[in-house]
Amino acid sequence: MGSEMCIRDRKYPELPISEPVKPITFWIENTTPVEFRGAVKEGVLRWNRAFRTAGFKNAVEVRVQPDDAEWEAGDIRYNVLRWTSSPRPPFGGYGPSFVNPKTGQILGADIMLEFVYFTNRVKYDKLYEEILNEDSVSEKCLAGYHLNQGNQFGFVTSMVSDYSSELKKRLINESIVQLVLHEVGHTLGLNHNFKSSYLHDNTRVHNKGITEEMGLTSSVMEYPSINVAPPEIEQGEYYTTTPGPYDKWAIEFGYSIPLENDELEESRINAILSRSTAP
């Protein structure tokens, strides 16, 4: 059976952190290219870091739709990361959900992942093959059309002299993780947070030891620019790959188990809300 987009109870309520009785389950559509599935899965599972603040571990799980599945990816009983390919899509990813109109409870969700995002917007070797002296490919014209002027231009002008295959793989992987983090955030009930661009100073932002734990920005619900280190500084993460402080706070507010006593519950909620302006 499918899975609701909620977790109601903990297996061991006496413990501060417990697995849920029933986790939120996402399915990767079986049409998703194999080379992208690992990054897609990683982007979903990273939300487990945020759910720990709500008292849950392993709150979210990911499975791959079997090739012989007897259910379609459009079946609303399943939360599916859909793989789509459109000629001129208006988005790289889209995370709609549907709710109970009486309670607001999120009942289910589908996430649309556009193939063009991975082929034209993050495969920089396709965009700049002439600079890199690589062979021509059929995607070249489409790549030029979909060029993002800001962060992608800055990336190439800074890094083209050291554009290794390892660098390309890491860049693509991080961009997929960031996109999936963002879209899953929508399905969990989080709106855009365009005030969360800044978290670290110009030194800490390139320290992977810091950003891999805290994120590059305060929230994955931002539209972040690519993070490019200047020539004299070792390159850190290009994109945020973990929920930020705001995301963890929002999940704690929305998914932590309420207390039975109304007065104590009100105090608990107010204590969480009082941290809304914390750095």
Where are these regions (language model features)?
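Short, small-residue-biased leader/transition segments that mark boundaries at the very start
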Residues: 2-7
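Zn2+-dependent metallopeptidase catalytic core
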Residues: 31-59
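The catalytic-center signature of Zn2+-dependent metalloproteases
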Residues: 64-85, 90, 174-230
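Conserved catalytic/binding loops enriched for acidic/polar residues
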Residues: 166-167, 171, 196-279
